[in-house]
């Protein structure tokens, strides 16, 4: 038996979750002390008010009431635009939730003809609860997961729009103060999301347990709906937010920077507010929902496999909750790690920012390895058995620790390889920048080659972690490796959210007409944020591959498939169709960004041509029209990709059966991961090649610049092509592979009973 008793588990998990939420609120309270509203005395000429505290001595001349007012106005415009978009999207997503909840109930309830009689359990002796009740609880957990995901995304966006202007104003004190404000704000989102995800899942398990009692097989099967709800909302957040942000970004860049030769975030550009809104709805709300979905799904996959292993059969609640205990330890580890950035060390110069963020990843991974070792010793029996395709495999507690540790360190390796290929501090991006000498075509060729090459090491890291974890603990080992990769999610999310907050802060500084030296500081924050955003995408894609495989294993077990035979025609046709789906999905999202950007370009050109004095800065552009174009386009364009992902498992499972569906899932996983990594890294490299030329921090960079040169224009074109790759198609693909797998798992009993209708008549 485990050292940690059931009572200890019941205390430890919610306490860690609550500590995470309290820490998030404390960070928010500290950020809120930075005031964006000028004091009453600040309007008086020469008045010495509190705002004098902001300014470093040589910039005392900037103690200007108007700067603070402008920052507040811009922040309000960005916040209102983001809120408006999310509420519009949530109306459509709400309708989808209701319809899909009804489908879950009808499909799963029909397995035993809506009977209320108990049935013999599949994997353990005894009677399990009726399928009708499992259908009801699966529907409830789907709605809970969906609502938690939506609330997490919304709160993340609210925090980011609350923090952006505060980061700008703190930049007047120095780069260190601005960094801490942006990072604390990111930490609010990271801890709020990871802690609330854990607490809601734990409460759901305990509430469902009141009904299910000893039927843990049915209990954890119904919990899988939580992962499906979280990930389906993430799909719409990522795709809708990605289309929104990139339509605005491409439109603003093409007309503003290439045609009109005005700087990024120039207030004369009509698309500039839409562009800044997009950073929040795509990179904050979408990314938060994405990682929440990964966490929920890997937990569900581990719980489903554990419920039919010795943990579930022997009703060992502490060992059963091992995935949740790992996440609980992760919250405490991330809390300690965050203090290193905010309290123990101070950033004094711009070149200290990126190392500080990288240290966060290394410290959290090292501490988490120790934490997992301790919890594996306390929570797991010395020996236990894990379900492995019809047989039980004996595993030790240290074996399972090794599975989690392999996933944890594989995530760090993927993160740093991603950084190597996307940071302009290293030769790959510098080579891409150098290729701009001969125009945009060579820039595109070099960027694509970099993206394809960047797939190699992450895939080997994923392959090694799959082989090691499967050899030790079968599919449960893979699920725990995925959870290991996601165990430092609070720190990962804090670093990820820091990027868009810094980006917005730079935009606000430019629009408020602040000193170029303030802009240099926000640019330094943004440059580090760009690299860490690429690292975050690497984590998301790597964890998605492991999560998808773990869900695939749970689906195959639940559907009663003994072996997936690639030589079987039923499986093979699924395999090649599944491998095609990421291309179809990417085509839809890329085209959506392109068509939305076309409308945006036309509108921006129209305003420059028809509004007198706009180019001279004497007239204001119509920001609202551009915001509306992005909102309408993203809502309309997110439906077809969403339908493709949600309907494919239902159609394939019902018409062709579980064997073909298992082929589709395997094919989508194999091709989707490769495209996602290459798309994200290609786009990230083009973006940083452009920034490398703009910054001109080395002799080589200065030989390619300055802004407005032919080299720079070629780099801007590459960056514009890369925008939808790195922020729409690439990140959305990891949701495609996870979502199809978790949906197949939820509907597995229905497909096993009624699936393969077409083959029955052929």
From Swiss-Prot:
Cytoplasmic-side positions: 34-81, 160-182, 245-282, 343-350, 422-443, 502-530, 599-627, 686-728
One GO cellular component, as annotated: vacuolar membrane
Membrane topology: Multi-pass membrane protein
Record: residues binding substrate: 246, 726
Ranges of the Intravacuolar topological domain: 1-6, 112-131, 213-215, 309-316, 379-397, 469-474, 560-569, 657, 755-762
Compartment list: Vacuole membrane
UniProt xrefs under InterPro entries: PPase-energised_H-pump
Binding annotation for Mg(2+) 2: 249, 723
Domain of life of the source: Eukaryota
Residues engaged in binding Mg(2+) 3: 279, 503
Major site of localization recorded for this protein: membrane
Reactions that this protein is recorded to catalyse: diphosphate + H2O + H(+)(in) = 2 phosphate + 2 H(+)(out)
Molecular function (Gene Ontology), one example: metal ion binding
Amino acids binding Mg(2+) 1: 249, 253
E.C. number: 7.1.3.1
Entry-linked HAMAP family: PPase_energized_pump
Family classification: Belongs to the H(+)-translocating pyrophosphatase (TC 3.A.10) family. K(+)-stimulated subfamily.
Additional detail: Has few direct interactions with pyrophosphate. Interacts with the substrate via divalent metal cations, such as magnesium ions, that are bound to the pyrophosphate.
Subunit structure as annotated in this protein's UniProt entry: Monomer.
Domain observations: Has 16 transmembrane helices and a cytoplasmic domain that contains the active site.
This protein's name: Pyrophosphate-energized vacuolar membrane proton pump
Native source organism of the sequence: Hordeum vulgare
Source lineage: Eukaryota, Viridiplantae, Streptophyta, Embryophyta, Tracheophyta
